[in-house]
Regions:
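N-terminal activation segment of mature serine protease catalytic domains
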Residues: 5-90, 109, 248, 253-264
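Active-site region of chymotrypsin-like
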Residues: 68-75, 134-145, 170-263
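Conserved hydrophobic positions within beta-strands
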Residues: 89-91, 122-124, 176, 214
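Short, small/polar residue-rich loop motifs at catalytic or cofactor-binding pockets
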Residues: 83-86, 106, 206-210
């Protein structure tokens, strides 16, 4: 079984009202719900396409510079499991932030923080664990929404943004190695969930990047980071078409939804 998409969490205690966190230690969360399997292929690197090294060539554009201001960090106390998860997200509509479902699993009161350190309380209004997408409503968020583009093609040079290892903000290059369909394995039942369309990226994805956007040179969102391979510089992202479908289903939601349970 190939292991990819393993969410990582920074274990933190004592979340204060000013959202200052004392980092106690890093904890790898080996949740099988975010482990992908593709037939009997044993190597993660062979899930979609052969691995290549992450690119060093960066994409520079005014559009990407503007997009960076709409990429946020997600902080949320998962009290049942005794840790605070950190991840990334981005504004997809007025007052609506996209992130991964595993970032806010078991979190009742997420906090959104921008690169300037400003924070806003949010409410999870959409949760899809099969596609690993969640939406957070932040009505007072003064950040501009990003445009959702079309799916990237294999060989495309893209940029992914987020807050690896709990920050600071970083924008790094990636190459789309391939796009394909796979399934997640439910951690509780062992049964396969619905098919998930994903990119395989040559990218130095780290814990904390989960939920961050993958963008083209025009600053359009073409994907959402959700995991990495256990070895090498290979990351995985949800496609723009999957994100668009989720936004059509739950982008207008305003009521809080259950975030399920966190996983130790």
């Amino acid at each position: 079984e190939g292991n990819v998409g393993i969410p990582w969490y920074r274990r933190i205690f004592g979340l204060s009202s000013s959202t200052k966190h004392e980092v106690v230690k890093d904890r790898i969360n080996t949740v099988r719900n975010d482990v992908l399997a593709f037939g009997t292929i044993p190597e993660v690197s062979q899930l979609i396409a052969p691995e290549t090294s992450a690119p060093t060539q960066t994409v520079e554009s005014a559009a990407l510079d503007r997009a960076a201001a709409s990429v946020v960090e997600i902080l949320g106390a998962a009290e049942q499991c005794g840790y605070t998860s950190t991840g990334s997200g981005f504004v997809a509509d007025n007052g609506l932030v996209v992130t991964n479902a595993h970032v806010v699993a078991g979190v009742t009161s997420p906090v959104v923080q921008d690169s300037r350190g400003r924070t806003w309380p949010g409410t999870v209004v959409y949760m899809d664990t099969e596609q690993d997408l969640a939406f957070i409503s932040v009505p007072k968020l003064p950040l501009e929404p990003l445009t959702i583009g079309t799916n990237a093609t294999a060989g495309s040079l893209v940029t992914f943004m987020g807050y690896p290892k709990g920050g600071p903000f970083k924008a790094l290059p990636a190459t789309v190695q391939g796009i394909g369909n796979t399934q997640t394995i439910d951690a509780d039942t062992g049964r396969a969930n619905a098919m998930r369309q994903v990119y395989q990226l040559a990218a130095d994805v780290q814990h904390g990047n989960s939920g961050g956007p993958v963008l083209d040179e025009n600053g359009n969102v073409v994907g959402v980071i959700f995991g990495k391979a256990t070895t090498g510089q290979t990351g995985y992202a949800i496609t723009a078409s999957t994100l668009k479908q989720a936004l059509a289903e739950g982008g207008d939601n305003t009521a809080a939804v259950s975030t399920g349970t966190c996983r130790k």
